[in-house]
Amino acid sequence: MNRFVMLTMSLIPLYGCSHHAPMATVDYVDVDRFMGDWYVIANIPTFLEEDAHNAVESYSKNTDGSIATTFTFLDGSFDGERKEYNPRGYIKDTESNALWGMQFIWPIKADYRIVYLDADYTKTIIGREARDYVWIMARTPVLSQEEYEELVQFVGSIGYDISKMNRVPHSWPDQPIGNKDEKEMS
């Protein structure tokens, strides 16, 4: 038993190690411009969002500097139950504002990295150092196929297995939808 405990204890420092190169973030995020609604276009989903439709992540600044986050989606179909989660974001790197901790349950803050952000703040990619989950998001629920493919290729270039990507279905009454009911990467 003592050998087992010693072996286990000796492996603890390796727990956080990854076989990937460190994941770079964007150089700088203007937090005020980043706030607002982001449609989740595609992802490698967590178990909570595996069959999400009309997924939207919304951010707003709290007076204490944290980020109030509202993640909503319809579960299973466009007629599915509306789900809502409210994690709190914490900016961990105030020089770039691109490295956050996202807290769903106290005291755990999940890794949240803004790894891509276009100049006009209309498209972003959120990644994690472990490369287990990723989110492609945009200010509109529709991207052209060319834009979508470019973003998916970027996800692949930073070490993700893009065969695990899901395209999130969107159907909004006032928007022409180009990716409705598409679950595969295309």
Could you tell me what each predicted segment is?
Residues C17-S186:
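A beta-rich soluble binding module of mature secreted/lumenal proteins
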Residues N2-T8:
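Sec-dependent signal peptide recognition
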